Amino acid sequence: MSETPSKAKASKPAESKAQASDSSGANQYAIVEASGQQFWLQPNRYYDFDRLEGEVGDKVSLKEVLLVSGKAGASLGQPYVKDAVVNLKVLAHRRGPKVIVYKMQKKKKTRRKNGHRQELTRVMVESITVGGKPLS
């Protein structure tokens, strides 16, 4: 008879849970409509929008808020959340990466090359408020 090696005790996998950061804006967010697009915004983060009016350092308010979510729950607008405002600070005006468009007709010696760089505004989300009170 051959001996079978004894199986080592199956150890439990290490109980490591990914702890979400306990910062104030960890689970707060708002979905807003700006520049014909919808953006998911969280406090104290920066985002790039199509060029917005305003100088560097100016404050901008977005009132087209589609959804707001915080510790108290979510509020969905129809189409916009009443009295909800997202306050932004303009950090910089920049240009996006260059996009090359190349059109060609084969056998015709027709070629056209065009480049484009989108004008962007980098903003920092300062606060999300509903009814004049900060989201919590």
UniProtKB/Swiss-Prot annotation:
Compositional bias annotation for Low complexity: 1-21
GO cellular component terms given for this protein: cytoplasm; ribonucleoprotein complex; ribosome
Record organism: Synechococcus sp. (strain RCC307)
Keyword list, A-Z: Ribonucleoprotein, Ribosomal protein, RNA-binding, rRNA-binding
InterPro entries per UniProt: bL21-like (IPR028909), bL21-like_sf (IPR036164), Ribosomal_bL21 (IPR001787), Ribosomal_bL21_CS (IPR018258)
UniProt signal peptide: none
Record PROSITE patterns: RIBOSOMAL_L21 (PS01169)
Subunit structure comment from the entry: Part of the 50S ribosomal subunit. Contacts protein L20.
A GO molecular-function descriptor: structural constituent of ribosome
KW Cytoplasm (keyword) present: no
Protein name: Large ribosomal subunit protein bL21
Pfam family, one: Ribosomal_L21p
Gene of this entry: rplU
Family note: Belongs to the bacterial ribosomal protein bL21 family.
Record-linked NCBIfam families: L21 (TIGR00061)
